């Protein structure tokens, strides 16, 4: 298991109350493959540095998890297929 941090920028037209339940469906991919979700931090609506898909704002979510590389790539693939996800960034957070 490796530690990862995933930043997800969601469509700002979403209701912020529905963000956590909709993310749970994606995070179940990690749990099903034996990984663990350490922390889900919903930052809320923030201004983007530049427009993405004609949106000047986005709902930021940061997820800390431990999983296998194949599981994380599958999670990233599923997030990118979702229309409400504007952008994702996956980083390995090895602590040296």
UniProtKB/Swiss-Prot annotation:
PANTHER family: MITOCHONDRIAL 28S RIBOSOMAL PROTEIN S6, SMALL RIBOSOMAL SUBUNIT PROTEIN BS6M. GO terms for biological process: translation. Belongs to the bacterial ribosomal protein bS6 family. This is Small ribosomal subunit protein bS6. GO terms for cellular component: cytoplasm; ribonucleoprotein complex; ribosome. Keywords: Ribonucleoprotein, Ribosomal protein, RNA-binding, rRNA-binding. Binds together with bS18 to 16S ribosomal RNA. InterPro entries: Ribosomal_bS6, Ribosomal_bS6_CS, Ribosomal_bS6_sf, Ribosomal_S6_plastid/chlpt, Transl_elong_EF1B/ribsomal_bS6. GO terms for molecular function: small ribosomal subunit rRNA binding; structural constituent of ribosome. The gene is rpsF.
């Amino acid at each position: 298991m490796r530690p990862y941090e995933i930043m997800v920028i969601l469509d700002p037209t979403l209701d912020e109350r529905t963000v956590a339940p909709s993310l749970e469906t994606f995070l179940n991919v990690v749990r099903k493959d034996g990984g663990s979700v350490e922390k889900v931090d919903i930052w809320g609506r923030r201004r983007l540095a530049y427009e993405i898909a004609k949106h000047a704002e986005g709902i930021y979510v940061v997820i800390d998890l431990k999983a296998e590389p194949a599981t994380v790539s599958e999670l990233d693939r599923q997030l990118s297929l979702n229309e409400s996800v504007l952008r994702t960034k996956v980083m390995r957070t090895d602590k040296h």
